[in-house]
Amino acid sequence: MGCPVKSKFSLVDKPTLKIDQRLLGVWKFKGDSNLEDSNYVNAVEITQYSTTEYQLSVSQVSEIYEPSTFVFRAYLADFADKKWLIVNNEEDNTNYFFLIGYLEGNQLRISELGIDMTSEDISSKEAFRKYVNGRPFYDKNSFWIKQ
């Protein structure tokens, strides 16, 4: 997981999907669609927090990672007919959004939601959801391997 757009709004009010056991474990960054082989976060351990939530513990970072925390809560949700991993930073109550494009065996491909929150008039959760539903923009794809 890189440094995607962060928002004080979320795509959904609560998790809409149960834990996907295939996501549990240690994931290492293997590259992205920009042919970069380093990321803000290079390894993360995903554990089960509850029946609908994960705990993400960042275990390996690059020198450009400026964390407010190394531990996040996350959950899965269906939004706009897509499966999302929504990651919450409880320290500053912001959310990050990753579209799950592929999860098979020990391979995961995610796409970061890319919205310029400063240039858009997004001042409510309804406006945020409408914007993402109407014209989502995905930043880079990143590829991860489960250890």
What function would you assign to each model-found segment?
Residues P4-D20, D32-V41, Q48-Q147:
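Calycin-type beta-barrel ligand-binding domains and close structural analogs
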Residues Q21-V26:
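A glycine-anchored, Pro-Gly-centered beta-turn/N-cap motif
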Residues K28-K30:
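Short edge beta-strand/loop segments characteristic of extracellular beta-sandwich folds
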